[in-house]
Amino acid sequence: VVRLPRSGALHVRRELPAHFSLRRSAQLTYAIENRSPRTLRAGLVEAPLRTLDLGEEELVTLLPARSEVDASLAALPVARGSDTFTRIYVWYESALGLVRRRFVIDAPQAFRVYPDLSAVERYGSLHVRNRLVEAGLRRMRLRGIGSEFESVRDYTSGDAFRAIDWKATARRGKLMVVQREVERSQDVMLLLDCGRLMTARIGAQRKLDYAVTAGLSLASIASLASDRVGVVAFARRILVARAPRSTAASVRALADVLCDVEPHFEESDYARAFAYLRSHLHRRSLIAFFTDVIDPVAQSAVLAELGTLAKRHAVLCIFMNDAVVSGALARTPHSVDESFGLSVALGLSAERHTAARTLQRSGVIVLDVPAERLSIAAVDEYLRIKSRALL
């Protein structure tokens, strides 16, 4: 007769990574201790989770007598937000596999899946670092065509004609330009549309997921420039509201707040959101508005408000276009279905261009890029706005 030790002879401890990032593979580590005098073969599987895809395979390992073995399981975060591990289903058997015993471990463990900022971190270490360091951020300054005089230097190719200091040029006999310091400690407000239009998926992620990631990416770079960053997320009502604040801790707080923001299957109340901004933003600010206004009803509501808002603030309206639509526009149709798809794509494209032109005529800066490039494009546009003193 083959006898197995009691379930108490097997002890399992789960260890989580420091944090989970959306769509970035992570490893769950398990310390599995065999307290029995026999070699055992064991396996475990986690209870299903909303935010993590753990695959369909069990974690299986061989446990020598009175030993502890570390094993890992791949996890792919598929949704943002808070979640909790609940139970671990464990089995173990003799080395020959003749007898198997099963038991369940209650192991509640809370965790959160954050937006993936790895792209902007890589970008920040290269492009942004170059852009900002060249602009003087080594001395914690952003140089450009701001309003504060800093110095006079030799003219170099690419300098604006209006930056030439003609008096200094006459004195020194060569072209000289005024170097001005771009203003710091300015306000940046992220405005996130969390209504019906942002529930649609582009690839594996929802539009709001892309918007949240891009917003936090912009906030991270703005903190390098010592700008204050706040956020308003809204659907039919205001979901999240944080006044602009400075320091890196504020960016971490924004990440915590936006981690759990979800899109709502309802029409967004744009008038309410813009009214909130008008009553709470008392100084000129950059408003980075993440939305996807493509239907005529939503467009009219937004356009009625944005023109007025743009008279007092710098408004950046950020759309994300779908690669499927772009692909349909680029292909020559060879069937009725493809022709129908092209017709739909042309209609969507025309609506987007109409909305963009109308917004631009109202003084709004419009950014319309593929969702996969949203974070980098938003950061680039922020840097352009700062360097040209548009804020």
Model-assigned labels for residue ranges:
Residues A225, V261, R283-R284, R312, ...:
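Structured helix-beta-strand junction loops
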